[in-house]
Amino acid sequence: MDQLDLFAEAEEIPATFTARPAQSRPAAAPRPAAVPAPRPAPAPRPVVAAAEPDSLFADPRPELPAVQTPIPARRGVTPLMIGNPRDAGQRLGEAVAETWHASNWGGYRMDIPVSIVAALALFPIKGHTEDVTRIISTCTDWELLQGYREIYAATWSSRPDLGARMAPLMGWLTEDGVEEKAYAVRRVTDTALKYGVLQMTGSTDPDSRSDTDLMSWTITSLRSHGARQGLGEYHTPPELCDMMARLTCDAESLQKGAWFHEPAGGTGGMFRALAQHLRNHHLDPADFGWAINDLDPLAAAGAAVNAIVWGLGPSVVVSCGDALRQGDVVDQAIRERAALIEERNQIVGYLATVEAYGEAIKLADRLMAGPTAA
């Protein structure tokens, strides 16, 4: 579970304030009371001069004990019972939208709450839902934002083609002043955890992760009715998708390597149903090809997220464009996919070369220093 370092556990961090008294000269020794003497006039008593401090930190009084002001750790989120995953997905989307709108950021930046749900669904550690929930819900704001950056970086490293399509979900993490959004990000994160985002996407079995389309429910709930009408974007009921998959796909006659195409697929609800249909016939969706397109960049980004969450395999192409006007959006996406994978390989190879060069320099330094250097 080394990868759990993506979100370091929050601990109680004491803020120490040492109450040191102000530096001052010690008061002069008081004159003792006059003692009568048989002599006509008593001799004057000398005044004891005040001693200078030995140094800046000399202090004639004892130092007060340190004051410990503990900062209490955040309380973890306790998820609700999700019940039917499809109903739970709708509840999560609606709750996230309500939380986001109540955080004073409004709907004009719906990419941020969608990005949060997507990142939690993509969390690379599967099968440790309780641990992951505790770590995320108790980490600091800085760790939370950094954790989201690392999730998307890891996604790009493993699937650069799909990671590039998720660009609309990543931009806010690199903006100036992103820390100012931490309060709203925290609230949406807690809401998504409470409503079971990890319960629905944190299993090691892709079949269990394919019961619902969280990205569609989240985007639909956040988008205004007018915007949905303008885009022609509506959430297709999963029961209808299931029926259409059964009616249109003869799983018994399918050959491995066959491709499925969806020119206006939204976040991929039909592909989710089709993948489950294949699994019901003991077929692995990763043995087939999947090409999906949508006009809306945010929906296409959601489809890229779902392709990983649902385990559709390595042969996935997600494009964004007007399929009726352009016609070749899938072919173009296939070419872009090959270029992105090549670019990733070059970058990783360059980083490996730099690391190897650094290790070689260290080894040469040790050799030249001789056996006594250790």
Task: Indicate residue ranges for each PLM-predicted region.
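Long, ordered, amphipathic alpha-helical scaffolds
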Residues: 311, 316-373
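Charged, often flexible domain-edge or linker segments that flank or initiate folded functional domains
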Residues: 2-26, 31, 39, 44-157
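Short intrinsically disordered terminal tails
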Residues: 1, 373-374
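Conserved S-adenosyl-L-methionine
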Residues: 236-336
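Conserved aromatic-histidine-acidic binding/catalytic patches
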Residues: 104-108, 180, 202-210, 232-236, ...
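A short mid-domain helix/strand-loop element embedded in enzyme catalytic domains
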Residues: 200-253, 273-276
